[in-house]
Amino acid sequence: MIEADRLISASGGREEEVIDRAIRPKLLADYTGQDPVCEQMEIFIAAARQRGEALDHLLIFGPPGLGKTTLANIVANEMGVNIKTTSGPVLEKAGDLAALLTNLEPNDVLFIDEIHRLSPVVEEVLYPAMEDYQLDIMIGEGPAARSIKLDLPPFTLIGATTRAGSLTSPLRDRFGIVQRLEFYNVKDLTDIVARSARCLGLDMTEDGALEVARRSRGTPRIANRLLRRVRDFAQVKSDGRIDGPIAARAMDMLDVDNEGFDFMDRKLLLAVIDKFLGGPVGLDNLAAAIGEEKDTIEDVLEPYLIQQGYLQRTPRGRIATPRAYAHFGLQRPDEG
């Protein structure tokens, strides 16, 4: 199973990125949720603008689908500067990064997604650029090679990552501002769904937005994806208006339950409960029981179940929590 194939995957494809771009907020005033982050960024941006300086380099980390790219674009808009976007895997050679840096205007933003995947060679070039706004370039080869320094205009590097722990210490230490994005609560997600519905010209009630939000796993990207599928259902099966009952029927058809679980989430939990008496069960046995790769279980299925308190990893194996039993209306063996 590929994560991107799941309706409730937080990863987004290129086509979805284009659609989401049309409904993204452009300014902090339009950005819903992440209140501590927004409050801090508002102050940092205002101070940098008053001084006429580039904003300090910014690292944004957190689970996928929470709005790291959106926030980077908002920072550029609020600063009134251009943004150039790339990603860690794309920057294979030092020259790739140098080409981007030398084309920046004063105070521009360079946004690097998946910055934890930068190659060591590219990272070495980035250090003096971030610290001194200088670019060290090697001219020629062999004994005749020499290093020259190019001055760069002041700029802001914004790095985004889902794995802050994978960043090297020298790179992480060069960011003056570090922000973590958290999963969204249902209220904020409801507001996001309602705003997206307005941007798409949909007739949606508050309870319809709530129904989509509560099944979106705290993630705006999933909420917007579910909204588009609910729109399709309402268009074909009703008069196009999205209310609570219509949204619930659409979600049931899509096999996304009240907690945002899909078939694979439920299959894993029920395997632990039914086949292994609630656990503990080792990863090898669990993978064989549900017919999935071990990496898929560890990287795709388990994280959300653990975060929400439905599954525990222990030294002896996986254990289903009381909350998992309650979700399926089952009684724990020790309660029988």
Curated annotation (Swiss-Prot):
Region feature (Large ATPase domain (RuvB-L)): 4-184
Residue segments, region Small ATPAse domain (RuvB-S): 185-255
Alphabetical GO biological process terms: DNA recombination; DNA repair
Binding site for ATP: I23, R24, G65, K68, T69, T70, E131, D132, Y133, R174, Y184, R221
Residues that, per the record, bind DNA: R313, R318
Region (Head domain (RuvB-H)): 258-336
InterPro entries assigned: AAA+_ATPase, AAA_lid_4, DNA_helicase_Holl-junc_RuvB, P-loop_NTPase, RuvB-like_N, RuvB_C, WH-like_DNA-bd_sf, WH_DNA-bd_sf
Main localization (coarse): cytoplasm
Binding positions (Mg(2+)): T69
Residue ranges crossing the lipid bilayer per the database entry: none
CC per GO annotation: cytoplasm; Holliday junction resolvase complex
Pfam families in alphabetical order: AAA_lid_4, RuvB_C, RuvB_N
MF (Gene Ontology): ATP binding; ATP hydrolysis activity; four-way junction DNA binding; four-way junction helicase activity
UniProt KW DNA damage keyword: yes
Function according to Swiss-Prot or TrEMBL: The RuvA-RuvB-RuvC complex processes Holliday junction (HJ) DNA during genetic recombination and DNA repair, while the RuvA-RuvB complex plays an important role in the rescue of blocked DNA replication forks via replication fork reversal (RFR). RuvA specifically binds to HJ cruciform DNA, conferring on it an open structure. The RuvB hexamer acts as an ATP-dependent pump, pulling dsDNA into and through the RuvAB complex. RuvB forms 2 homohexamers on either side of HJ DNA bound by 1 or 2 RuvA tetramers; 4 subunits per hexamer contact DNA at a time.
Known partners and oligomeric status: Homohexamer. Forms an RuvA(8)-RuvB(12)-Holliday junction (HJ) complex. HJ DNA is sandwiched between 2 RuvA tetramers; dsDNA enters through RuvA and exits via RuvB. An RuvB hexamer assembles on each DNA strand where it exits the tetramer. Each RuvB hexamer is contacted by two RuvA subunits (via domain III) on 2 adjacent RuvB subunits; this complex drives branch migration. In the full resolvosome a probable DNA-RuvA(4)-RuvB(12)-RuvC(2) complex forms which resolves the HJ.
Record-given protein name: Holliday junction branch migration complex subunit RuvB
Organism: Aeromonas hydrophila subsp. hydrophila (strain ATCC 7966 / DSM 30187 / BCRC 13018 / CCUG 14551 / JCM 1027 / KCTC 2358 / NCIMB 9240 / NCTC 8049)
